[in-house]
A protein has these predicted regions:
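Short secondary-structure junctions
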Residues: 36-41
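Conserved metal-coordinating catalytic motifs of nucleotidyl cyclase and c-di-GMP turnover enzymes
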Residues: 2-5, 51
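Flexible, glycine/charge-rich interdomain/linker segments that couple
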Residues: 135-170
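A short glycine-enriched loop-to-beta-strand structural element that forms part of the catalytic core
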Residues: 48, 82-131, 143-149
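Short helix/loop segment flanking the catalytic signature motif in cyclic-nucleotide metabolism enzymes
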Residues: 53-88, 121
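Conserved short hydrophobic interaction patches
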Residues: 31, 35, 73, 77, ...
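Conserved long alpha-helical elements within nucleotide-processing catalytic cores of c-di-GMP signaling
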Residues: 10-34, 47-51, 55, 61-68, ...
Length: 172
């Protein structure tokens, strides 16, 4: 599962307006769909879960190539959504929530990838995917990040301690 989100989208939406913001969301959806069709298989699926959040469901052997294609394409395509001045500067100068004017990077695509190997809950999937997406968003630019923990639903081996505890006869 790949959880995709747009970085710096609020600043773009506030600066360029909701209509242009909707175009950026549509651009992201189109690029993710293209990457899924180009690098995935017939079982791959894309879902828009709201706002600027998307979920791709694909086989592990496809999801990295899909994410790589999507982030590369989005990096090129998003530049066309900015005025010449912002595009050349590589950022947008806008007033933040704190009332201070500052420079914000262009919108970028961050993707967190998790793997599922067996039964698990939707809560576990959502929490882990959100955690890895947050990690991806902490890096600058258009990036994807894999969860390095064991896949969700995988059975972790339980250590076996042979002769670790004496039998009652041995203890006596």
């Amino acid at each position: 599962i790949a959880y995709a989100d747009l970085d710096n989208f609020k600043v773009y939406n506030d600066t360029y307006g909701f209509k242009n913001g909707d175009r950026v969301i549509k651009l992201a959806a189109d690029i993710l769909d293209w990457a899924m069709r180009k690098r995935g298989d017939a079982a791959s699926r894309l879902f828009h879960i709201g706002g600027d959040d998307f979920v791709l469901i694909a086989k592990p052997e496809h999801v990295e190539r899909m994410s790589q294609a999507a982030t590369r394409c989005f990096k090129r395509a998003i530049r066309g959504c900015y005025c010449t001045q912002d595009r050349e500067r590589g950022s947008v100068v806008a007033t933040g929530r704190d009332g201070v004017e500052r420079s914000y990077p262009l919108v970028s695509l961050s993707i967190g990838i998790i793997e599922i190997a067996g039964p698990c809950t939707l809560m576990e999937i959502g929490e882990r995917a959100a955690h890895v997406k947050k990690y991806a968003k902490s890096m600058p630019g258009n990036v994807f990040a894999w969860d390095r923990r064991p896949p969700l639903g995988s059975v972790q081996p339980v250590p076996v301690f042979i002769n670790a505890c004496p039998t009652p006869e041995e203890a006596a």
